[in-house]
């Protein structure tokens, strides 16, 4: 059991090194899939011998481990074949070599340059579908030779050229029969309408569904192919994707056009301004009510008022502060003369209830605990926390979970994820800064808190 845990920890360390390095070469991607295969083999062996947990990781069923191990073997073979081709020297990322990307249409091909297009059925802006097309597609022919072609879009769907044949991996006619009524549709790439809505003239049922002759597009009047790369270079001024929102896939549920969204946004902003103005009036009324209540109650509660008039909470606080200052002057020698500037932030322990008095407590609490705020992607921060706990030992007192800011009026996350690291002393924080090695794309800033 201990031997299995040690092997599993070594595999996890190697995987973390790959994720943090961010290398974009095919050798690293092959190593990544080989490690994933070894991980599933270890799980399979553990489950077969009755071990239900390796370290903190539950062991999946035998069928799950077997299926994932076979997927990893298949990916290793594909990548090793691609490595021997001229395209093996191109940069390859974890996303481009993931199982999900390889299995997405067109299946068993590598792709680069994803781009979203929209198809409107029945000329109805509410009946809109979104599809993912690719700028470049890498496929194997019958001789197991890799070829790189450009992805294209026409009225019938998204395709690429395999020799003299069009290989369609998305056909709009299929979804037109499901979601449309008239058999008409428009194709929109970015902000451009490529084709006017005409009756579909897709290949006949007797022809192949995956590939149609290259002159099949001549059967419709607006039939003209459009390269995915040319579209992306021609119209790049599109609204940036919203963070933490659901991204469009191929296909998603129906969406609305941008013009309707702009109208709704303008209406919502006008309503929001009205709501803000109403909210300001309500807050003003609450302040007036709270002031009247404080004025009516303060003669009974105020202790130090010389004239007996209304005393607010802020006035009572100022009076208590003046009393504490007068007491501290009378016993200044016992308080130790205050906290030196270099001592502020030197303690992280919360001051307990002691007979030293309020001034002693305030002086002790002036030493605030130091922290470091990290900003970056959630997965990178979690990986860094996992490694830092083993690498830096007791230098860090506490690690927070990942969190994000949200807006005052919405629940949408703002910016990147955050993580806090708390330390016992400033010296330990400085030592940690000298030793720490952050993943790419993660930055940091210093701070301190009143209490942890």
UniProtKB/Swiss-Prot annotation:
* Positions of region (Transactivation domain): 1-201
Q: Give the multimer and partner information.
A: Binds DNA as homodimer. Interacts with protein E1; this interaction greatly increases E1 DNA-binding activity. Interacts with protein L1; this interaction enhances E2-dependent replication and transcription activation. Interacts with protein L2; this interaction inhibits E2 transcriptional activity but not DNA replication function E2. Interacts with protein E7; this interaction inhibits E7 oncogenic activity. Interacts with host TAF1; this interaction modulates E2-dependent transcriptional regulation. Interacts with host BRD4; this interaction mediates E2 transcriptional activation function.
Q: Name one Pfam family in it.
A: PPV_E2_C
One GO CC term on file: host cell nucleus
Protein name, UniProt field: Regulatory protein E2
- Region DNA-binding domain: list its residue ranges: 368-452
Q: Which family does it belong to?
A: Belongs to the papillomaviridae E2 protein family.
Species name = Human papillomavirus 17
GO MF term set:
DNA binding; DNA-binding transcription factor activity; nucleotide binding
Which residues are connected by disulfide bridges in this protein? none
Composition bias, Basic residues: 256-270, 320-330
Q: How is it modified after translation?
A: Phosphorylated.
* Residue ranges, compositional bias (Low complexity): 227-239, 309-319
GO BP annotations of the record are: DNA replication; DNA-templated transcription; regulation of DNA replication; viral DNA genome replication
Keyword field = Activator, DNA replication, DNA-binding, Early protein, Host nucleus, Phosphoprotein, Repressor, Transcription, Transcription regulation
């Amino acid at each position: 059991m201990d031997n299995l845990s040690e092997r599993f920890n070594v595999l996890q360390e190697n995987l973390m090194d790959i994720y943090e390095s961010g290398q974009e070469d095919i050798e690293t991607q092959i190593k990544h899939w080989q490690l994933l295969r070894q991980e599933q083999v270890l799980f399979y062996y553990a489950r077969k011998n009755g071990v239900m947990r390796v370290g903190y990781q539950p062991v999946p069923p035998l069928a799950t481990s077997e299926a994932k191990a076979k997927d990893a073997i298949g990916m290793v073979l594909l990548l090793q074949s691609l490595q021997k081709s001229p395209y093996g020297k191109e940069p390859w990322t974890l996303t481009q070599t993931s199982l999900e990307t390889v299995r997405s249409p067109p299946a068993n091909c590598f792709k680069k340059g994803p781009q979203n297009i929209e198809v409107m059925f029945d000329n109805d802006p509410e009946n809109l579908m979104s599809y993912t097309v690719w700028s470049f597609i890498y496929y194997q022919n019958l001789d197991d030779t890799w070829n790189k072609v450009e992805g294209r879009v026409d009225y019938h769907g998204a395709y690429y050229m395999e020799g003299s044949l069009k290989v369609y991996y998305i056909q709009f006619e299929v979804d037109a029969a499901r979601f449309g009524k008239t058999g008409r549709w428009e194709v929109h790439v970015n902000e451009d309408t490529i084709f006017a809505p005409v009756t579909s003239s897709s290949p006949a049922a007797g022809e192949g569904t995956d590939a149609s002759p290259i002159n099949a597009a001549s059967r419709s009047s607006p039939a003209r192919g459009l390269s995915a790369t040319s579209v992306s270079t021609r119209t790049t001024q599109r609204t940036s994707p919203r963070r933490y929102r659901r991204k469009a896939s191929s296909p998603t549920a129906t969406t609305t056009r941008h013009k309707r969204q702009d109208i709704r946004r303008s209406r919502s902003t006008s309503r929001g301004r009205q709501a803000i103005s109403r909210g300001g009036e309500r807050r003003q009324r609450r302040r007036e009510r709270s002031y009247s209540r404080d004025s009516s109650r303060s003669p009974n509660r105020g202790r130090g008022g010389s004239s007996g008039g209304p005393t607010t909470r802020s006035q009572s606080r100022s009076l208590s502060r003046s009393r504490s200052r007068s007491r501290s002057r009378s016993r200044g020698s016992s308080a130790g003369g205050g906290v030196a500037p270099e001592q502020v932030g030197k303690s992280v322990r919360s001051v307990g209830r002691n007979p030293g008095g309020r001034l002693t407590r305030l002086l002790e609490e002036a030493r605030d605990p130091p922290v470091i705020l990290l900003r970056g992607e959630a997965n990178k921060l979690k990986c860094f926390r996992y490694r830092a706990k083993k690498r830096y030992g007791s230098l860090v007192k506490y690690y927070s979970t990942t969190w994000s800011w949200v807006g005052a009026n919405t629940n949408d996350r703002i910016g990147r994820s955050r993580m806090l690291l708390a330390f016992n002393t400033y010296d330990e924080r400085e030592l940690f800064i000298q030793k720490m090695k952050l993943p790419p794309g993660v930055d940091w800033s210093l701070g301190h808190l009143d209490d942890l």
